[in-house]
Amino acid sequence: MTKQHAYTREDLLRCARGELFGPGNAQLPAPNMLMVDRITHISDVGGKYGKGEMVAELDINPDLWFFACHFEGDPVMPGCLGLDAMWQLVGFYLGWQGNPGRGRALGSGEVKFFGQVLPTAKKLTYNIHIKRTISRSLILGIADGTVSVDGREIYSAEGLRVGLFTSTDSF
C-alpha cells in the first residue's frame, strides 16, 4: 500500500471492507458507525508531540441516524460517538504505519465534553496528536484528540489508547 497523506470517503469505505491495509489488519467500522467522511491530513511527523498528527472531518446533516433517537424532541449527537471517532482514527494511524492486526480501543485518560453537536451544524473536525506508538509484539498507539463543530472545540480526550492484535481470542 502506498502511504497517502489524505483519504477520501471511498478510501475510508475500502478500509471498512478490509481492503486498504489488507485482510486481518486495521479496519474502520462500516456506516453507520463510521464517524469520519474524510482524512484531510495524516503525517508521522508534527503535531503537539512531534510524533504524528491527523485531521479528519465528518459532514453533519439533520438526517444522520442518531438525531432521530437521541433524543426525541431534543436531537443531539451522542458525545460517545465523537470519542469513538477519535479511537477509530488512532487505529487507522497504526494501520497506516504498516502495523499488522485488528484494532481495539483500550481506553483513555481524561475526556471532557463542553459543547454539543446539533442537527443545524455543518462539520465536525477531529484533530489527533500522536504521543507514542509501540510497534513490537504489542502494537499500541497513544494520542490526544479534540473534536470541533463548525470551528469551535467541544470535546477533548487525553491518552486515547488503541491496540492492534493478530488474535482477539483473549478478549
From Swiss-Prot:
The active site is at H70. It comes from the Bacteria. Its EC number is 4.2.1.59, 5.3.3.14. Pfam families: FabA. SUPFAM superfamilies: Thioesterase/thiol ester dehydrase-isomerase (SSF54637). It catalyses: a (3R)-hydroxyacyl-[ACP] = a (2E)-enoyl-[ACP] + H2O; (3R)-hydroxydecanoyl-[ACP] = (2E)-decenoyl-[ACP] + H2O; (2E)-decenoyl-[ACP] = (3Z)-decenoyl-[ACP]. GO terms for molecular function: (3R)-hydroxyacyl-[acyl-carrier-protein] dehydratase activity; trans-2-decenoyl-acyl-carrier-protein isomerase activity. GO terms for cellular component: cytoplasm. Pathway: Lipid metabolism; fatty acid biosynthesis. One of its GO terms (biological process) is unsaturated fatty acid biosynthetic process. It is found in: Cytoplasm. Necessary for the introduction of cis unsaturation into fatty acids. Catalyzes the dehydration of (3R)-3-hydroxydecanoyl-ACP to E-(2)-decenoyl-ACP and then its isomerization to Z-(3)-decenoyl-ACP. Can catalyze the dehydratase reaction for beta-hydroxyacyl-ACPs with saturated chain lengths up to 16:0, being most active on intermediate chain length. NCBIfam families: fabA, PRK05174.1. Belongs to the thioester dehydratase family. FabA subfamily. PANTHER family: 3-HYDROXYACYL-[ACYL-CARRIER-PROTEIN] DEHYDRATASE, 3-HYDROXYDECANOYL-[ACYL-CARRIER-PROTEIN] DEHYDRATASE. This is 3-hydroxydecanoyl-[acyl-carrier-protein] dehydratase. It comes from Azotobacter vinelandii (strain DJ / ATCC BAA-1303).
